[in-house]
Amino acid sequence: MSETTLNAAEQPIDELVSWVKQHDFSLNLTTERLAFLIAIAVLSNERFDEELGEGELHDAFTIVTRLFEETGEASAFRANNAINELVKQRLISRFTSEMTEGASIYRLSPLAIGITDYYVRHREFSKLRLSIQLSMVAGEMAKAIEAAKQGGTAGHWKKNVYAVLKYSVGEIFDQIDLNQRVMDEQQQSVKQQIADLLNKDWREAINNCESLLSETSNTLKELQDTLQAAGDELQTQILDIQELVYGDEELEFIEETLFGLQMKLDRITSWGQQAIDLWIGYDRHVHKFIRTAIDMDKNRIFSTRLRQSVKDYFDMPWYLTYADAERLSDLRDEALVLRDDEVTGQVPLEVEYEEFQQVNDELAERIGEMLRLHKDNGKPIDLGIVLKDYLAQHPRTHHFDLARIVIDQAVRMGYSESDYQAIQPDWQAINDYGAKVQANVIDRY
């Protein structure tokens, strides 16, 4: 990005509006014109110098017009009009020189590259692409850290630290952010596909819907794992540079740049979990819709068959056998109140509250004792061990509820220094049934 563009981006809105009006900027791309522009971009990529002659543009226009027969024939007159429209909108640049004997050559403008790049190159957002971009960012950050450790004049900081952070790291972050927005669009596209399938024939569409839902869920999970792993490393690198420039008034511009990068990194890393949470909600909504549709259709089929059977009873007599059983109810409270499988029926609210409060007080006392030992002896608290020892004393059906209470009390009464250093803790088993917890050792009271 040029300094001119940067300065324009920092101007007030009214000045930017005046700038657009002064230069008479405008865009008007019909579907046919957009297809023509994309065709030019594809042909340009196949050329070493990315330049096209007028004849090649006419050929591209002919190819596009074949698929848009309703707009007219692919005449030279219409092709020239289309080319002139793109030139007027500054989507392609026209050059004429003596070397080409007066014939014009054409190149895509930066605006056209941005438009066609979105449609051509950004339609696939994969884990591989994200991994490459994150590796590039980590490499550039390592260069900036090395230059910052060496120190030097203001020119050294601007050239070897500021420039790397502002243009290399910042632009890669912007590219990742753009790709994530493309992924958001892909999710909307998948939702539209699912809606179309369910509207046509939901019975035939169930398997296809499940495939689309699972594929998107797996993709989001892989992307989030990649973001989480790389995000911690990038966070550490940003903190390292901040520590080197902290308190130096001459390097405030470095701190401002790091602050901007921190905001971008937070947005990038939070996107993955947010996308997963939103998709889980949509997944549940689709499954609920399918279950409701199945129930409704099942009842409709049954009533139709019953009416037909009654109508044909004298021709084909039949016996009716039915079974009547009590309806099973799920008594599990959404608030995660402790269950007791030995008791059936509804527990009075006073008993539920008393049982919950008793366990809560007991846990608070146990955690408080551990924290007092830490305070007196400097002994850290391993939350995984505390959970494992405590859960071993209770039935398996209580483990999930108890673990929630233990963690809630622990985070209220202490915290881990490792959390502020962006250190990713390892997973620890907390019972014999596969449950695991990921938590740093509590070492601050």
Swiss-Prot record:
Organism (species): Vibrio vulnificus (strain YJ016)
GO molecular function ontology, one term from the record: calcium ion binding
Oligomeric and partner information: Interacts, and probably forms a ternary complex, with MukE and MukB via its C-terminal region. The complex formation is stimulated by calcium or magnesium. It is required for an interaction between MukE and MukB.
Region entry Leucine-zipper, spans: 213-241
Subcellular location: Cytoplasm, Nucleoid
UniProt-recorded name of the protein: Chromosome partition protein MukF
Family: Belongs to the MukF family.
GO cellular component entries: cytoplasm; nucleoid
GO terms under biological process: cell division; chromosome condensation; chromosome segregation; DNA replication
One Pfam family cited in the UniProt record for this chain: KicB
Matching InterPro entries: Chromosome_partition_MukF (IPR005582), MukF_C (IPR033441), MukF_C_sf (IPR038198), MukF_M (IPR033440), MukF_M_sp (IPR036141), MukF_WHTH (IPR033439), WH-like_DNA-bd_sf (IPR036388), WH_DNA-bd_sf (IPR036390)
Top-rank lineage group of the source organism: Bacteria
Annotated NCBIfam families: PRK05260.1 (NF003615)
